[in-house]
């Protein structure tokens, strides 16, 4: 049977693309191989967002060519084929993000499909995450024009899925053991705008392609639902009652990027110190336990020490639960590259370190508030007898903290258990099964 090697790079949205490609390949009869040596061809799903990701992708392509020789490239960097072929002219094919059919065509030109996919009534689905959680992509592309970003050039304009299609996928995942659905998009809160929020039928029920209506129906599946990449639109407040009622996890991943109004204008992003705080305060009034994650860019062109201090002051006052930070890196094709007053690399790194130091204090302070409380924990791992590693509603996999739990030895991966918190670290919690 024909064997395919697969390398998946980039964000959770790219991971969903990888799962779709692998599911289609499996339906065609291909097997996946964990080694270059056994594979007859290798697919590399690339990232092309920042320079470091571009270089990582090019290196991965080079390694696959060296170890195997037959390589098909897809993903965000594939939207710039000249970049790939300049370094690696011997790749078999280059396709852009989300171009599943073109990937399949490129593979079949070299390795004919082992079987007719129509022999299977229900094609198998391949997951690259553990069985108990899964990423579900609501839309592709983005209509924003942030000056530091080229995602609209790589992935195109916003293209949402019908709500019934999303719900059908979610229901299939839950039926096969998924306990947590992580909803992703380039801009989750814009879901359905391009469709005019049209209705589609899920069973015999009409559901609008609008986030609140979608979540209301999805909540009936009875699993954790986590929202990622939520642009801070005013209508986000409409989702909060679902969190207050326990239908959706009280967790929002909101990439604010900065707090200085001047820098945000240069970034073509909304808000600023005061408006950010006002928004967060309003959300917390509805859902006091709301966990907030955000990402920030330091060292953006023109960022002064005063601008940076505004950001530090904001972090102290906002008390976000989780924070990611990037030192600004020019992205080929981004409009921000033309801005004056670039920040020296050493200053970028120094500011990044200072920001992380401030957030570490905030994170520890927030974590300590949970000592003595009992939290529900979703078990991710069982590294040794009597010990489990899991996550609370405050923790997305791979990017947030974890909870180390002393257990009675009977818990299973994917199980939700009550845990009494005994101790807090800067990012993680320690507790005992209650």
From Swiss-Prot:
Q: Which GO terms describe its molecular function?
A: 4 iron, 4 sulfur cluster binding; aspartic acid methylthiotransferase activity; metal ion binding; protein methylthiotransferase activity
Q: What residues does the TRAM domain cover?
A: 368-434
**Positions contributing to [4Fe-4S] cluster 2 binding:** 142, 146, 149
Where does the Radical SAM core domain lie?
128-365
Give the UniProt entry's GO cellular component terms: cytosol
Top-level EC class: transferase
Q: Mention any Pfam family matching this sequence.
A: TRAM_2
| SUPFAM superfamilies linked to this entry | Radical SAM enzymes
UniProt cofactor(s): [4Fe-4S] cluster
Q: What is its EC number?
A: 2.8.4.4
- InterPro entries this protein is in? Elp3/MiaA/NifB-like_rSAM, Methylthiotransferase, Methylthiotransferase_CS, Methylthiotransferase_N, Methylthiotransferase_N_sf, NA-bd_OB-fold, Ribosomal_uS12_MeSTrfase_RimO, rSAM
| Note on cofactor | Binds 2 [4Fe-4S] clusters. One cluster is coordinated with 3 cysteines and an exchangeable S-adenosyl-L-methionine.
**So where does [4Fe-4S] cluster 1 get bound?**
11, 47, 76
Q: Is Iron among the key words of this record? A: yes
Which GO BP terms, alphabetically?
Answer: tRNA modification
Q: What reactions does this protein catalyze? A: L-aspartate(89)-[ribosomal protein uS12]-hydrogen + (sulfur carrier)-SH + AH2 + 2 S-adenosyl-L-methionine = 3-methylsulfanyl-L-aspartate(89)-[ribosomal protein uS12]-hydrogen + (sulfur carrier)-H + 5'-deoxyadenosine + L-methionine + A + S-adenosyl-L-homocysteine + 2 H(+)
Protein family per UniProt: Belongs to the methylthiotransferase family. RimO subfamily.
What is the role of this chain? Catalyzes the methylthiolation of an aspartic acid residue of ribosomal protein uS12.
Query: This protein is called what?
Result: Ribosomal protein uS12 methylthiotransferase RimO
The organism named in the record is Thermus thermophilus (strain ATCC BAA-163 / DSM 7039 / HB27)
Q: What is the lineage of its organism?
A: Bacteria, Thermotogati, Deinococcota, Deinococci, Thermales
Q: Which gene encodes it?
A: rimO
